[in-house]
């Protein structure tokens, strides 16, 4: 992928993540107007992830057959419509319908990852995945602050703005993004590349890829468990308003970008991607365990910053490991399966977090630390597999 083409993809990813960054920190406070509480915010978050679980591997496989560009555009148009549904919502049912629609068309991340896999080599893959992850992260940095400010105009304004942003991203993908799948490959693989849900199982049996996907599932579950704790702890314990929540979330996301941009530096010092993942996962565990003991804004922020820093390395390393150990004609499908299992983590994390908040909000952070600990132990296995 040439620098110009990569720049276009990065711009689209920034635009896409900006919309999500605007609304995600506001879901709980906005949903409370319709009766959303500690338990149901987990279900609302999970609705998106369940729909995405079924959709992303199919969309990824379709991108292998028909090309990345049309599937990316469809995903972004679906996101635009879902944000509009949120803005016009009159009750809880519409909120859930909007999240489900966004999940069903939520193949943008896996398709973008497949585009990087198409056009990179093992040598520069981690670097390009780091750039892509930082692009998504950059939108999350700006988004919460923008959403917090727009919410002062009206509760619906952040969702209108996010819809416009998603529409711009879709139009950019249609008019400015070049296809990365070779036409001859698409034509010859239309019949051979039909997706089967058995891939959700067979992919896990791939020696390195399966372990990496499961580690990603655990770390995603930990992150989305933390997000529920972040939202409820910020509102109910720290008593922060929407603007301050947005700024705090912005700081958390910014730390991840710093590390993602440093991926080339880390890969020069440590050649093993699995070893980098191992060390960063250990740091995430320590940070999350510490956060469970915090009670004021300053100490809570310290824990989030440390976690955000080292969690930022996760996706570039895991995605590079998966792409390195995958065949070129299955990049979209396998990245879709990877995103599908991440969706399970996005589902189970909020649900278990919602149950734990019934007893202790601090317990959510300890639960997240437990998931990270399991992932850390599995990363030892991944490291040995990569060496062999």
Regions found by a protein language model. Give the residues of each.
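Short amphipathic helix-loop junctions that connect adjacent transmembrane helices
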Residues: 25-39, 228-244
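Residue-level signature of mid-helix packing/kink "hotspots" within the transmembrane helices
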Residues: 49-57, 107, 140-141, 253-261, ...
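Structural signature of the two symmetry-related core transmembrane helices
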Residues: 70-85, 275-289
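Helix-loop-helix hairpin linking two adjacent transmembrane segments in secondary transporters
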Residues: 131-175
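Helix-breaking motifs and short loop linkers at transmembrane-helix boundaries and internal kinks
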Residues: 35, 67, 88-93, 293-295
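Juxtamembrane intracellular "pre-TM" segments in multi-pass secondary transporters
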Residues: 1-3, 178-213
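Cytoplasmic helix-loop-helix junction between adjacent transmembrane helices
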Residues: 98-138
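Helix-to-loop junctions at the C-terminal end of transmembrane segments
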Residues: 56-67, 259-272, 357
